[in-house]
Amino acid sequence: MRIKVGETVAILAGKDRFVTDESGKKMIKTGKVLKVFAKTQKIIVEGVNIKTKHQPPSQNEEKGAIVKQEAPIHVSNVALVDPQTQTSTKVGIRIQSGKKVRYAKKSNQTLDEKN
């Protein structure tokens, strides 16, 4: 996958796409990638796609709980935020000195090396 854990992504689709600031202007929501599921091509983004989960009582805990947690979203609904320009960008792969390297297509900046 072209998105890694710890990177900042912009949400392109879904109910969490926009967030309103103090002046009422809509802005695209961004978040940090917490976990990547490569087989299903889904990611968990911090503070995005919050779902309510009802946990039944267990033997250790006497009471059940209602927990809010992030649910996975498909990787096609997000775009990487370019670290240089702070805008959403596509990720490209090129070969540099015999290794595959990811780069941001808008700024042409190398992101990191891929093993």
Swiss-Prot record:
Keyword Amino-acid biosynthesis applies: no
Keywords, ordered alphabetically: Ribonucleoprotein, Ribosomal protein, RNA-binding, rRNA-binding
Gene Ontology MF terms: rRNA binding; structural constituent of ribosome
InterPro entries: Rib_uL2_dom2, Ribosomal_uL24, Ribosomal_uL24_KOW, Translation_prot_SH3-like_sf
GO CC, one annotated term: ribosome
Record-linked Pfam families: ribosomal_L24
GO biological process assignments: translation
Family according to the record: Belongs to the universal ribosomal protein uL24 family.
Function, as annotated: One of two assembly initiator proteins, it binds directly to the 5'-end of the 23S rRNA, where it nucleates assembly of the 50S subunit. One of the proteins that surrounds the polypeptide exit tunnel on the outside of the subunit.
Subunit structure: Part of the 50S ribosomal subunit.
Protein known as: Large ribosomal subunit protein uL24
